[in-house]
Amino acid sequence: MAAIPIVTEAEVALLCPVSGVSVVEPVAERKWVFRPGQGGDLSVAKVLDYARRAGWKKLGILYSADAYGEDGRNNMRKLAAGAGVSLDREESFPANSTDLKPQLAKLKSAGVDAIFMHGLGAPSAIVYKNARELELATPIISGHGQANSAFRNAVGDAVIGQPIVGAPVLVWGELPNSHPQKKVSESFVTKYQAKFGIAPDMFAGVAYDSANMVLQAIRETNGERAQIRDWLENKIKNYVGVTGVFNFSAQDHAGLKSDALVMMIADKDGWRLADYEK
């Protein structure tokens, strides 16, 4: 957020890969800023779609007490009622948490059908480990911030069987051939692994898409700042990237829909695509 007034004054287009929608809204005040990543609003929409399919009517929220966690909580508050879901309990945790059993116990006592967890860092892994220690049978469904190898390695077997929102590139091999991101994800992952020896995470995909869009904007214009901004806003239509299918406009500088994310299930090897997504 601190960069926004700087790029606005300098009139330089900024592609800002963050979760919150406030970086691009209101668009009239954020005309130089675009969000090329999947946001918390899209992640929550995906969670609520899964809740509908699972028959969950009552959710609890467990979120990190930071901008990322609060963005997830705020989006859930905004969207839950429209999806026919009530929010029966909210609990937060600080970024340096080492024990989340008290919060989990309160959520359990609330009798919720599932717990929506939205956080980053080590405490997110502790949530699942503490849940196993408590023999908590309530499902825990995570936002897309946990869909990375660092979290998966830290949490170990405690997360197996739990649903988590993630980027299609993480499970590209299981995507149906009709999925618009199948081919571009395969190409990106193959090249990335050949160069770096590891599989990319979703953040690498966001950076790749951002760079490609900016480079194309420069090629298609004379490189003048305002023309680059205008090109991004007016010419990015049905742009199939690793992150999703982008459609920027004068009214929308986020440009993605919830189909830029998929629901995954954690397994012993990492993740697998939820059956209904195949």
Regions found by a protein language model. Name each.
Residues 1-278:
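Extracytosolic ligand-binding ectodomains
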